[in-house]
Amino acid sequence: KLFIYHCDASNENDVNDLFDKINKKTSKIDALINNVGISGPTGTIDKLNSFDWENTLKVNVISHFYFTKNAIPLLKKNKGGSIINLSSGAGIMGFPLRSPYAASKWAIVGVTKTLAMELGKFKIRVNAICPGTIKGDRMVRVIRDKAKFLKVSKKSVEKEFVSMASMNCWIFEEDIAKMCS
């Protein structure tokens, strides 16, 4: 069965309330897909403010903690399952002008590796997906902001992002969904 709920993923009380609702509907789950994230600010670290840094980490990393903490007991009751954390290519290589985003995605990779070691004995698989450039509204903003910061064309920034992908092409949301299924 699939249940759909809405909550503020960066608010621990909202996530806890969400899992209270889930616990009333079912005693176990098969999988958790942590796909919460924001792009965060663009710029050199000396030009960024602490609010944007902290907010990027809160949404991109701490929200995963809230969901994972609540999901683990349900996965254990199921005697196994899967946690899939969405990270980014920025979580495995440097990402100039995007340090808060990169830091958050590296954190997700580190937590994923740690949880895989901790939860394997419960038959809970934990993996990260680290896609390249995903076509969508978020990337439109990231490209715009980077082009503005560097004073170059959006087209040149777009080419740069696409060239970083191993297949030199855009990744689409549907591709990510297929990886999770």
Indicate residue ranges for each PLM-predicted region.
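Active-site helix of classical SDR
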Residues: 68, 104, 112
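C-terminal helical subdomain
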Residues: 128, 152-181
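The beta1-alpha1 cofactor-binding region of Rossmann-like NAD(H)/NADP(H)-dependent oxidoreductases
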Residues: 6-17, 50
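Substrate-binding pocket helix/loop in short-chain dehydrogenase/reductase
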Residues: 43-45, 49-54, 161
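Alpha-helical segment proximal to the catalytic Tyr-Lys
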Residues: 73, 117-121
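Residue(s) in the substrate-gating loop at a strand-loop-helix junction
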Residues: 88
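Active-site loop immediately N-terminal to the catalytic Tyr-X3-Lys motif
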Residues: 45-46, 93-99, 121-122, 168
